[in-house]
Amino acid sequence: MVAVLADEALYEFTGGEPPTLEQLQNRYAAQVVGGSADGAEWWLNWMVTRRDSGASVGFVQATVRAGTNGSVADDSVADLAWVISGPHQGQGLASEATGAMMLWLRSHGVTRFTAFIHPDHGASQAVARHQDFYPTDQVHDGEIRWESGQPASQ
């Protein structure tokens, strides 16, 4: 994944820089735990590979927060994110992978989804729209919160 994430253009909207091998190993070691120590969050991190070649092209991830009753699988919300390397963008891979993750999460009781997207990141906005997300008025760290479903006014 170091080579996949090496393209500096991937960080145009999110900030940061390509991770080193050591940074990526440390990140994955923390993520493989699968959730917070108190059980209030699940962490899913799926590598996206091409079906035709098996080549790694990016990832899709979810942070699932517990709902009002404290259970992750009931009344919970999943914050989603996706990254696809430059040469593989625009082919529907992020939409397909995100949709697959949402399907899996729904099968485990998650019904609400969000994503935080930079206002100028048209490609990520297209992925969100493909999943029936809509932009809200909420902004966090310069990114707009998108939510699944229909806006409250509809």
Where are these regions (language model features)?
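Conserved acetyl-CoA-binding loop-helix of GNAT-fold acetyltransferases
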Residues: 62, 82-83, 90-107, 122-131
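GNAT-family acyltransferases
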Residues: 1-86, 104, 108, 116, ...
